[in-house]
Amino acid sequence: MSPPGSAAGESAAGGGGGGGGPGVSEELTAAAAAAAADEGPAREEQRPIQPSFTKSLCRESHWKCLLLSLLMYGCLGAVAWCHVTTVTRLTFSSAYQGNSLMYHDSPCSNGYVYIPLAFLLMLYAVYLVECWHCQARHELQHRVDVSSVRERVGRMQQATPCIWWKAISYHYVRRTRQVTRYRNGDAYTTTQVYHERVNTHVAEAEFDYARCGVRDVSKTLVGLEGAPATRLRFTKCFSFASVEAENAYLCQRARFFAENEGLDDYMEAREGMHLKNVDFREFMVAFPDPARPPWYACSSAFWAAALLTLSWPLRVLAEYRTAYAHYHVEKLFGLEGPGSASSAGGGLSPSDELLPPLTHRLPRVNTVDSTELEWHIRSNQQLVPSYSEAVLMDLAGLGTRCGGAGGGYAPSCRYGGVGGPGAAGVAPYRRSCEHCQRAVSSSSIFSRSALSICASPRAGPGPGGGAGCGGSRFSLGRLYGSRRSCLWRSRSGSVNEASCPTEQTRLSSQASMGDDEDDDEEEAGPPPPYHDALYFPVLIVHRQEGCLGHSHRPLHRHGSCVETSL
């Protein structure tokens, strides 16, 4: 029976002449999509590991039990040797008028057999005590069934994390006390000086992640029914999906400890993470049916084997038949993907849109500088990109933004108008070409004239440029200065579009001093600033044209070919 609200909705939809059917289906589809979005991406599966015999020995060797067992076996061997072995003895007795008497007897007949027996009894007592300690540890283990483990894992995944910091300010106070000492039977009193720790201030704080958000990225624990027993270990950890979330964590942490650092002579810093409203247990053992465990896990079988000095083989068998699983409860702070902070506050900047998406999470590390440097190198938000990163940038979206700016001046359209119609026509051609490989260079700063020539849709003939499909050559950047000529040169080929850029890149080192002077005259003005280095054009090298049919020596770099005349 449906609730009144649902019934009213159905009657209203029916009165509308059947027009509410598609609306209801759309609402159901939207609700299902929202539920799927709430569930998040599919989790990875984790299964318990069944160890081999050697790994089970290395994991838990029980060396004390093994050593005591070997010593007891040695004592039993000595007693058995005393009863089995016979030696020939020669004695002289006055009853036989001074004649010698030879007979066979045990080597331990004179009471030597009691020595290994005493050692055996002592070792057996120590052995039973060690077995009692082992059984007590097993009894203290938290034994649960498989369904309880699943429920506990689900609660830990849904639990709210709390990263806490604690600062304890303290100092030491010099105190004295009277103690009584004894020397040569005489008692005398002396003064002892000691230092006592005094805590003066205790402060606690938590990480406020309301702005960056958090979600659980733990794996799904499956396959617990396949093993007779599974030993589980749970650990808690956290990571960051964006540098903004990590910077927020580090800033709050540094601010908290900085506020409490100078309150006293010393400060003890503690930090950790706990899950709210969850009884966290690090170790537990899961059975399909805890009321009926395997025979080797019963206490009666354990004590029977212990009395027969067979406790160590039983323990090895139990370790071999027990599966192990180390489960990490991981919480991810921050939103996945590039520009999490900017997406929450507004649109992306042009430089952020050109950056590749973030594909790896940033784990929590102890060193702050290395994490920030790794992020800056990866995202390239504050460092000037290299040539290989500049050629991978998508200029089509940049050209669209520059073309739609109208007559106004845009910073991204400087140095030759990268977003002009020529660049818009070049981008589809580059995407459709399957044989093109982008050239790689670690240091190249483009000049103003080179960029204007490259971005010009229809440059006239002259020393600095030519027709769209002509054979002009121009300098894009200087690597070693004016005295050592090593220039990137490009020669355009025949393509379908008239405004296409060059299709072959060559590295020439045979320029003379006259060429250097011409290049110096051509490079009028200083190089572009760092901000404009993000909008450099793309150089393309054809694998077939650049590698075959030339007498120069080819240089291969990551699948592409750059000609050089060494």
Curated annotation (Swiss-Prot):
Lineage, broadest ranks: Eukaryota, Metazoa, Chordata, Craniata, Vertebrata
Membrane-topology descriptor: Multi-pass membrane protein
Region (Disordered): 1-25, 495-529
Skewed-composition ranges (Acidic residues): 514-524
Domain of life: Eukaryota
Biased composition (Low complexity): 1-11
Annotated GO CC locations: membrane
Protein name (database record): Transmembrane protein 151B
KW Membrane (keyword) present: yes
Start-end of Gly residues biased regions: 12-23
Transmembrane segments: 65-85, 112-132
Biased composition (Polar residues): 495-512
Keyword field: Membrane, Transmembrane, Transmembrane helix
Disulfide bridges in this chain: none
Locations listed in the record: Membrane
